[in-house]
């Protein structure tokens, strides 16, 4: 029996055939924080990604858009806080972040224009 962490072959193949438009839907924006800046020195980059994005999709999108080799992807979901808006309770949206580990020596210049 396979462990729940293993991705199916079909899921990996779907991720490899993603269109450029689908890649932009998976990766929403880079996350620029103090922690992300420190991690960039160790060949890691942090992105805000779609809430339903899988690790193989994130890996394929980063490799396809930025032309780098990805070693691994760690993800987390920040649950939206309950806040009050005009006296009524509301809910902020959940946010999914992806920590992407690149091959040593590679980096992504997030200030450059994507072609």
UniProtKB/Swiss-Prot annotation:
Gene Ontology molecular-function annotations: rRNA binding; structural constituent of ribosome
Coiled coil, from the record: none
Cellular component terms per the entry's GO annotation: ribonucleoprotein complex; ribosome
Any one GO biological process: translation
Pfam families linked: Ribosomal_L23
Keywords: Ribonucleoprotein, Ribosomal protein, RNA-binding, rRNA-binding
Keyword hit for Ribosomal protein: yes
InterPro entries assigned: Nucleotide-bd_a/b_plait_sf, Ribosomal_uL23-like, Ribosomal_uL23/eL15/eS24_sf
HAMAP family associated with the record: Ribosomal_uL23_B
Subunit and partners: Part of the 50S ribosomal subunit. Contacts protein L29, and trigger factor when it is bound to the ribosome.
Stated family: Belongs to the universal ribosomal protein uL23 family.
Primary role: One of the early assembly proteins it binds 23S rRNA. One of the proteins that surrounds the polypeptide exit tunnel on the outside of the ribosome. Forms the main docking site for trigger factor binding to the ribosome.
Protein name: Large ribosomal subunit protein uL23
Lineage: Bacteria, Pseudomonadati, Pseudomonadota, Alphaproteobacteria, Acetobacterales
Name of the encoding gene: rplW
